[in-house]
Amino acid sequence: MSVWPRWLAAVVFALGFLAATGASAEVRSLKLYHLHTHEKAEIVYKRNGRYDPEGLRKINIILRDWRRNEPTKMDPRLLDLVWEAYRQSGATDYIQVVCGYRSPATNSMLRSRSRGVAEKSQHMLGKA
């Protein structure tokens, strides 16, 4: 048996290890600007493949129901989806937030004023 297959296997292993290490060393952040509160922040919410509790807390505050000053726990999968769209689009500016979380009371109030507000809005679940 020649040395070539062992060498090739070692290279493939090393490249796979480096790729996996690079992915786990990834830092994800979102640049948010809330149009109603005028709050602006760049927040790291994920490091090395794990959600950063302090970053999530900060995002929950900026995406709170601003009418009632009531935060919730936003779904981290939503943040990953927004991050991925932001990255793929090549955007570099702040993401303009119109609405994040809505309390049931706020959703009910908005629903009474507009037919375009869902009764069981994803905003009330921290998913929009």
Outline where the language-model segments fall.
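Bacterial N-terminal signal peptides that target proteins for export
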Residues: 1-9
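Hydrophobic helical h-region of N-terminal Sec-dependent signal peptides
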Residues: 9-18
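N-terminal signal peptide c-region/cleavage motif recognized by signal peptidases
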Residues: 20-22
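Cell-envelope/glycan interface and biosynthesis
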Residues: 27-128
